[in-house]
Amino acid sequence: FFPERLLLADLIPVIDIHTWLPTRLFPDFDPNAVENGSFFEYIKNTYCCTIAESSRSTISVTAASPDMAKTLRLSSGDPVLILDSYMETPDGSPLYISREYIAGSRYTISF
């Protein structure tokens, strides 16, 4: 499955998420079930999946392409954070892969 989600804050797009889910783990995945809720809670509760500590994410920055700018309601060339995540189960099997395009002017990351 390749679900896409657009997360809004006060009806303004903040994050455009593209996810790959293996169908063998999520045979009846319902994108509507996560429309207004947590993706992680849904897969944990519905499929009893656990994310391994070895999972990893990287953050990079790019300039918004015309298509990305349209989706996130930005100007072309505005800064966009890219969060790439590779999540796996404790036994090392791929759980999901995602790429999130985050409007740089509308989001803060804290560590």
Where are each of the predicted segments found?
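C-terminal all-alpha effector/ligand-binding and dimerization domain
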Residues: 1-111
